[in-house]
Amino acid sequence: MVKNLLVELGLEEMPAYVVTPSMKQLRDKMGAFLTDHRLTFEKIEMFSTPRRLAVRVVGLADKQSDLTEDFKGPSKKIALDADGNFTKAAEGFVRGKGLTVEDITFREIKGEEYVYVTKEEIGRPVEEIIPAVTEVLQALTFPVSMHWANNTFEYIRPVHTLTVLLDEQAFDLDFLDIKSGRTSRGHRFLGQETEIASADSYEDDLRAQFVIASPLERGDMIVDQIQALEEEHGVSIEIDEDLLNEVLNLVEYPTAFLGNFDAKYLEVPEEVLVTSMKEHQRYFVVRDSEGKLLPHFISVRNGNAEHLENVIKGNEKVLVARLEDGEFFWREDQKLAIADLVEKLNNVTFHEKIGSLAEHMERTGKIAALLAQEAGLDADETADLARAAAIYKFDLLTGMVGEFDELQGIMGEKYALLAGENAAVAAAIREHYMPTSADGELPDTKVGAVLALADKLDTILSFFSVGLIPSGSNDPYALRRATQGVVRILDKFGWNIDLAQLLGRLYELKFDSLSYDNQEAVLDFFRARVEKMMDRSIPKDIVTAVLQSTHFVVRDLVETAALLAEKAQEDNFKSAVESLSRVFNLAEKAQGQTAVNPALFENKEEKDLAAAIEKVVLTSDLAANLDQFFALSPVIDAFFDHTMVMAEDEAVRNNRLALLASLTAKAGQIAQFNQINTK
């Protein structure tokens, strides 16, 4: 017979960003716990609010599965003495398994007999296992934790209740400083403590106390209420998924309402208003049918509709204070001169080990000038890039960005346009921050893209140069995001920029403020980011071989890996790769020498291979490039069949190694073929 198990942990209000991950973690750890304890189940349902985490295990077996295990012991010749009696070795073995020598059998393995015992464990009733679920709660991890009262332990927030029910049966367990039972808490203001009758009645019992336990249901309620307000007021409301997910984790009983603000604030840039509403107040933005911002907002109350008019007034008052700040900064910032703000950046620290923001901008400007050539910018674009690089951080010292740091770059563009900068320069100031997340929006303009690349490259190289390199999951300066941004921008614009060569040129640049260092570590860091762009179905050895190539153009690397993975299914792949691998392995002994003297050739096969290598011309057609090298396989094999590479004559030997190295110099731009596993 199956049962349903409810486990609910009641806490003080958790931060919204913690709720959903913690709920999923509880589900996963509970599932692992039950599996480890040989308890089968149909599914695990999840529940959470700001003040609770819960799971309901549906279709839980009423007892553990029986367990039968075979254990191999010592060989028969060790287990029995000369008289055929069990030795101490045999007795010790079975005693350790809780058995006796009477349970011993012998089994033959590869011509020799060994002791075997079979141990059977009858499954225990689920009621005997449930007390251990506190181990699951104790194992939960959180990004932040705290002490409370006189306790020595830490948890995300103080724990008030623990409800553990198997159908209708409540369990009295100890967890941290509380006892479990069937008591739960209702809404902080509208509800009260309540008894949960059974695992199945959980949602209904809490609903009666103004708690909607299911986050999915709360989300649906919020969306339905917003859509009703849309219809009632004839407006269009942006339901931002991230904001919705945050808001539903701020409330236990949601009630959406529409508030208003003075239309005069619409004269402030829309981004300021939207940031004030979404980022600071967690409000949904209201627009008309054409997408124009309206002087309204949608908020969600943690409670019912009683006295809602007071709640609306309170929210309107709070928002107006924010909008007043935005209006003030918008007006005052326009009185500031860009040149004065740029000069003050000399006094703003980028990082104490790296220098000022002004020095960062100077290095970025030099990198941008170099990249302008690589990206093929014309004269006007290059001039716009130089101007943007000279001023692009000025808005960090404006009042608006000081108050709303989410608007950095965005306000820079607006203030630059007001100051008379052209549109390309202004757009680059905004776009240089892109992307702001792993899959965030990328720059649209070439000038903005190059400035973004230059800014990120100096950031990466500077931090690596002073030893501030990400390790494990620790990346306080977001260098992985910056590196991923470089890779994604290069891929989007399809610029044929070889990152390895580019880094080499950057490391030759000289600055008064900093000397770049750790070049190989930076290149490895980029390799790791490019690897994440590749199809996960591509074998690891192929990915490694491609990433170790001497040609480091992002788009080419991704495409080459995919092409090699396709070729791996062809009949000639194994033989071709093995031939090339042999060349790569021997060519390492050439120590970089690729100059070949045809006068030292002693057989036809040497001449044939040299001629074949000479004919290889790499183009932008990556598939054709691969085909050229795979077609060399018979010529390579013939060379090895008739040629002793490591000849006694040093000149002949070195010439043959140089011949092979001349091939790897070309093939190595595709992949390090000896890294590919053909077995």
From Swiss-Prot:
The keyword Magnesium does not apply. GO terms for molecular function: arginine-tRNA ligase activity; ATP binding; glycine-tRNA ligase activity. The keyword Repeat does not apply. Its EC number is 6.1.1.14. It is found in: Cytoplasm. It catalyses: tRNA(Gly) + glycine + ATP = glycyl-tRNA(Gly) + AMP + diphosphate. InterPro entries: DALR_anticod-bd (IPR008909), Gly-tRNA-synth_bsu (IPR015944), Gly-tRNA-synth_heterodimer (IPR006194). One of its GO terms (cellular component) is cytosol. Keywords: Aminoacyl-tRNA synthetase, ATP-binding, Cytoplasm, Ligase, Nucleotide-binding, Protein biosynthesis. GO terms for biological process: arginyl-tRNA aminoacylation; glycyl-tRNA aminoacylation. Belongs to the class-II aminoacyl-tRNA synthetase family. NCBIfam families: glyS (TIGR00211). Tetramer of two alpha and two beta subunits. This is Glycine--tRNA ligase beta subunit. It comes from Streptococcus gordonii (strain Challis / ATCC 35105 / BCRC 15272 / CH1 / DL1 / V288). The gene is glyS.
